[in-house]
């Protein structure tokens, strides 16, 4: 944006479209949890395999060169296309880059968080041996004063919260714990 002197804006559709986040923020800001000392975000990395990276001819309805845009030219593979493109560094940063902004939005909003002091992360590709590139297991620690904030990416739902689905945010306070997804909380 700076190079081309453009103004940009990032919006988060879940923040605006689903009333659950607003209700979670109200509960946390009202003090129902006490002082929140820990936020843990969990995203399931999904199924064990998404297919293989076999090269083929793009379907006739897909203008593959247009779809690639400025990304490096690569042979077409359905795995590099719709729905799974996010697992290749040429196009995305994987599940973390795709989903972190959505589920962490509620924590930033509820706790009035700004930029962390530092972030450390470790991960790799251990489970989905399908030719994709981005991590399928990942742990990130965000350093905020007085707050333990982590993001975890692993196969399967968060242990203990399987009933909540594949992406959750857990707020642990001195008085209570709250777990939320995009559409519900408890």
How does the language model describe each region?
Residues 13-17, 42-45:
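Short, solvent-exposed turn/loop segments enriched in Gly/Ser/Thr/Pro and often Arg
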Residues 5-6, 22-23, 35-186:
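Contiguous beta-strand/loop segments that form the cofactor/metal-binding neighborhood of enzyme cores
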Residues 2-3, 18-26:
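Glycine-/Pro-rich loop/turn segments that contact NAD(P) or position catalytic residues
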Residues 1-16, 31:
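Beta-strand-loop-alpha-helix segment that lines the small-molecule cofactor/substrate pocket
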């Amino acid at each position: 944006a700076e190079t081309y002197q453009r103004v940009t804006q990032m919006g988060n559709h879940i923040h605006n479209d689903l009333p659950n986040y607003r209700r979670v923020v109200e509960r946390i800001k009202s003090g129902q949890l006490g002082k929140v000392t820990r936020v843990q975000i969990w995203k399931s990395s999904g199924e064990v395999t998404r297919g293989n990276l076999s090269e083929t001819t793009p379907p006739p309805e897909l203008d593959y060169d247009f779809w690639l845009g400025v990304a490096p030219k690569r042979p077409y593979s359905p795995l590099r296309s719709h729905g799974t493109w996010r697992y290749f560094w040429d196009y995305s940063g994987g599940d973390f880059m795709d989903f972190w902004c959505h589920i962490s939005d509620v924590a930033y909003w509820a706790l009035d968080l700004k930029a962390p002091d530092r972030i450390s992360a470790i991960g790799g590709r251990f489970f989905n041996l399908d030719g994709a590139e981005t991590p399928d297991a990942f742990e990130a620690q965000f350093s905020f004063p007085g707050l333990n904030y982590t993001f975890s990416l692993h196969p399967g739902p968060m242990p203990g919260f399987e009933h909540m689905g594949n992406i959750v945010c857990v707020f642990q306070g001195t008085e209570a714990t709250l777990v939320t997804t995009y559409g519900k909380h408890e």
